[in-house]
Amino acid sequence: MADEIKKENAPKKLSIQRRTKTTVSGTSTTGKSKEVQVEVRKKRTVTTDLERKAQEQAKLKAKEEAEKRAAEEKLAEKAKREAEKAKAEQIKIEKAKAEQAKASKKNVDVEKEKRRAEEAELRRKADELARQKAEEKAQKAAEEAKRYADFDDSDNDNGKLDDYSDYHLTSSYALEAENEEERRNENRGRSKNKVVKAKKGGRDDENGNKNERQSDRRNQKDVKGKGKHAKKASALQQAFTKPAQVAKADVVIGETITVAELAAKMAVKATEIIKTMMKMGEMVTINQVIDQDTAQLVAEEMGHKVILRKENELEEMVMEDRDVNAEKVHRAPVVTIMGHVDHGKTSLLDYIRKAKVAAGEAGGITQHIGAYHVETNDGKMITFLDTPGHAAFTSMRARGAKATDIVVLVVAADDGVMPQTIEAIQHAKAANAPLVVAVNKIDKPEANPDRVEQELLQHEVISEKFGGDVQFVPVSAKKGLGIDDLLEAILLQSEVLELTAVKDGMASGVVIESYLDKGRGPVATILVQSGTLNRGDIVLCGFEYGRVRAMRDENGKDIQSAGPSIPVEVLGLSGVPAAGDEATVVRDEKKAREVALYRQGKFREVKLARQQKAKLENMFSNMAEGDVAELNVIVKADVQGSVEAIVQALHELSTAEVKVKVVGSGVGGITETDATLAAASNAIMVGFNVRADATARRVIENENIDLRYYSIIYELLNEIKAAMSGMLQPEFKQEIIGLAEVRDVFRHPKFGAIAGCMVTEGLVKRNNPIRVLRDNVVIFEGELESLRRFKDDVSEVRSGMECGIGVKNYNDVKVGDQIEVFEVVEVKRAI
């Protein structure tokens, strides 16, 4: 329904079709005329009024748009014409300015040319005047000479007049005038901006000059060329000159280098280096590692300059780049307090700390950093290291850091010398630190200080009372008796040692202890040994490095700098350093990082090398400098009698070449302290009816210490003897294994003289050295070149058999000679 309504409302069209018929005449294929009827249908559509109105509106709209577009184009054309007009005016103005500038420049050039001409004229006049003066002077000199010549005799008149008539031509004035004239002519012919043209004339006498002038003209033409093809003057010059000889680069050689690396550095083939080394008597492969000296010889042989470089050159350079010529001043002593458990070490430390730290700081010690310094009544300073036990003390010594100057040995007056007291004495002696003995607990009624002195005599600690150099000070840590006397004794000992250090300069010290704090990161306690450590310094500590972000003293207060013998807590390192590591201030953080990475890379090699350090089989490599080798031993036994017997027997084993040194001995099981001492001293540990505890076993495993258990003393002594025998230099002995008598001599084209022999004794071997005897006198010593039985090459011939022997490099064998075959045998020496 809706569709029908829509169709009714739609504009109606009236279509009229017209049919038209017509006739077209044409020519057929046979040439006759032919008529064809064609029907044309035309269709005309008549639109209604609505459609006509819509078409008119569309036409009006199109007309308006066309007019609008025409107006816009007209405006654009007008704007374009105005822009072109403005541009033309601008070009006209610029052209006028350029012409004005050109005219002014032309005027300036004219003025310059005029001024130049005037100067040239003035110069010419001056030259002319100078020439005239020179000629007048020469003429006067000639006339004067002529006048002098008139007074001479008539015989010499003609000759002298001729001589003086030429004077104006040969005198210095005339020569000067001629030189001036030549210079003037040269200057007159030159022009600043023009090339002098050759004169056109007849044929040249030589073709070479003509060719040169032609090439010059060609070059000038090329230089003066115009356009993009014109050549620059610099293009005529040769850009590269071939060197007369091959340039030899400097070769940087480390401590070791492979043949391939050396070839790359020398820019040659590896085969050339192998050939050179073959000529030098060394057979190598392309990947073989050669040492620095060999590489230097090869490089110099091939004409290169060698620069030797150590692998740790950067580390040495960083360490040596320090302040020098700084003045040394007196420094405070660094003291470690050691002793047996419950003998009063901690009480003594606490009393000194409370009594000598300033009143305002007495209760203000917020944290314990392992070290602190106090001032005495005289205003002098002492630094105390609080190292619980002896492990840290020995570890620092094992790493080569001698932090302690003086050891205070605390012994209880009522208890006497105990096992840990003896250990402390051994550690102090191993570190070469002087002892000061503090006899504690003298306030007790059962105290007996004299007994302590007597017992320490047995351990070579001799008091001043008995003529020794060890100070004994009776103290009471509980009541504070003798504390000032102890401090005075420490200061007296430090004066004897004459302790000095550089105060102003880059600091160096040792790490006392370190740990990782959750909030602050790696924290290290550093004892400054020389120089001044400032906040912001770059510190290198073993494998770690970093800039000092903060420094605190033992009271927890922030400080800006610390001098010698001052312990400080440092923040800012890249990691936690090991106790005993050396701390050094360096200038460059980048170089410090490189050194730290280099040390980390070398750590594994050092660890592997340490595994072989204390093995019995390699004790020969640990020989001390000189002829005498030392075997360090630590002895632990179940009873004192066994210890004394073993130590005495070991001392008796010592010889002129190998000495046994008992580094430590004691009663009881093997402790961590014993293991640390063995690692520090490269010692063998011997346990007689005792065993190591768990912590000691861990240290022994980490440090690869040689630990041996025994229950029979003879087995112990025999193995120590074997170790000492291995450290002795071996002996070599010659043993005669065969003798052959020469029965006849034959000549061989290849081997020369061949001795026909009968083996009379022993065995003749092909590869053994020989001697030729004549009348029981050795006339030649060498080796065999050939050994044959009949026509077969053999390796050995037994007694009673005939053989042919060719002696290498010796042809004077005669009938009746004896050929003696021997071998060199290594005889192991035993103690």
From Swiss-Prot:
<dbReference type="GO" id="GO:0005525">
    <property type="term" value="F:GTP binding"/>
</dbReference>
<feature type="compositionally biased region" description="Low complexity">
    <location>
        <begin position="22"/>
        <end position="31"/>
    </location>
</feature>
<feature type="compositionally biased region" description="Basic residues">
    <location>
        <begin position="190"/>
        <end position="200"/>
    </location>
</feature>
<dbReference type="InterPro" id="IPR027417">
    <property type="entry name" value="P-loop_NTPase"/>
</dbReference>
<feature type="region of interest" description="G5">
    <location>
        <begin position="476"/>
        <end position="478"/>
    </location>
</feature>
<feature type="binding site">
    <location>
        <begin position="386"/>
        <end position="390"/>
    </location>
    <ligand>
        <name>GTP</name>
    </ligand>
</feature>
<dbReference type="InterPro" id="IPR009000">
    <property type="entry name" value="Transl_B-barrel_sf"/>
</dbReference>
<keyword id="KW-0547">Nucleotide-binding</keyword>
<comment type="function">
    <text>One of the essential components for the initiation of protein synthesis. Protects formylmethionyl-tRNA from spontaneous hydrolysis and promotes its binding to the 30S ribosomal subunits. Also involved in the hydrolysis of GTP during the formation of the 70S ribosomal complex.</text>
</comment>
<feature type="region of interest" description="Disordered">
    <location>
        <begin position="1"/>
        <end position="236"/>
    </location>
</feature>
<comment type="similarity">
    <text>Belongs to the TRAFAC class translation factor GTPase superfamily. Classic translation factor GTPase family. IF-2 subfamily.</text>
</comment>
<dbReference type="InterPro" id="IPR000178">
    <property type="entry name" value="TF_IF2_bacterial-like"/>
</dbReference>
<dbReference type="GO" id="GO:0003924">
    <property type="term" value="F:GTPase activity"/>
</dbReference>
<dbReference type="InterPro" id="IPR023115">
    <property type="entry name" value="TIF_IF2_dom3"/>
</dbReference>
<feature type="compositionally biased region" description="Basic and acidic residues">
    <location>
        <begin position="201"/>
        <end position="225"/>
    </location>
</feature>
<dbReference type="InterPro" id="IPR044145">
    <property type="entry name" value="IF2_II"/>
</dbReference>
<dbReference type="InterPro" id="IPR004161">
    <property type="entry name" value="EFTu-like_2"/>
</dbReference>
<dbReference type="Pfam" id="PF00009">
    <property type="entry name" value="GTP_EFTU"/>
</dbReference>
<protein>
    <recommendedName>
        <fullName>Translation initiation factor IF-2</fullName>
    </recommendedName>
</protein>
<feature type="binding site">
    <location>
        <begin position="339"/>
        <end position="346"/>
    </location>
    <ligand>
        <name>GTP</name>
    </ligand>
</feature>
<keyword id="KW-0648">Protein biosynthesis</keyword>
<feature type="compositionally biased region" description="Basic and acidic residues">
    <location>
        <begin position="49"/>
        <end position="150"/>
    </location>
</feature>
<dbReference type="Pfam" id="PF11987">
    <property type="entry name" value="IF-2"/>
</dbReference>
<feature type="compositionally biased region" description="Basic and acidic residues">
    <location>
        <begin position="157"/>
        <end position="166"/>
    </location>
</feature>
<feature type="region of interest" description="G1">
    <location>
        <begin position="339"/>
        <end position="346"/>
    </location>
</feature>
<dbReference type="Pfam" id="PF08364">
    <property type="entry name" value="IF2_assoc"/>
</dbReference>
<dbReference type="InterPro" id="IPR013575">
    <property type="entry name" value="IF2_assoc_dom_bac"/>
</dbReference>
<dbReference type="InterPro" id="IPR015760">
    <property type="entry name" value="TIF_IF2"/>
</dbReference>
<dbReference type="GO" id="GO:0097216">
    <property type="term" value="F:guanosine tetraphosphate binding"/>
</dbReference>
<dbReference type="InterPro" id="IPR005225">
    <property type="entry name" value="Small_GTP-bd"/>
</dbReference>
<feature type="binding site">
    <location>
        <begin position="440"/>
        <end position="443"/>
    </location>
    <ligand>
        <name>GTP</name>
    </ligand>
</feature>
<dbReference type="Pfam" id="PF04760">
    <property type="entry name" value="IF2_N"/>
</dbReference>
<dbReference type="Pfam" id="PF03144">
    <property type="entry name" value="GTP_EFTU_D2"/>
</dbReference>
<dbReference type="GO" id="GO:0003743">
    <property type="term" value="F:translation initiation factor activity"/>
</dbReference>
<dbReference type="InterPro" id="IPR000795">
    <property type="entry name" value="T_Tr_GTP-bd_dom"/>
</dbReference>
<feature type="compositionally biased region" description="Basic and acidic residues">
    <location>
        <begin position="1"/>
        <end position="11"/>
    </location>
</feature>
<dbReference type="InterPro" id="IPR036925">
    <property type="entry name" value="TIF_IF2_dom3_sf"/>
</dbReference>
<feature type="region of interest" description="G3">
    <location>
        <begin position="386"/>
        <end position="389"/>
    </location>
</feature>
<feature type="domain" description="tr-type G">
    <location>
        <begin position="330"/>
        <end position="500"/>
    </location>
</feature>
<keyword id="KW-0342">GTP-binding</keyword>
<dbReference type="GO" id="GO:0005829">
    <property type="term" value="C:cytosol"/>
</dbReference>
<keyword id="KW-0396">Initiation factor</keyword>
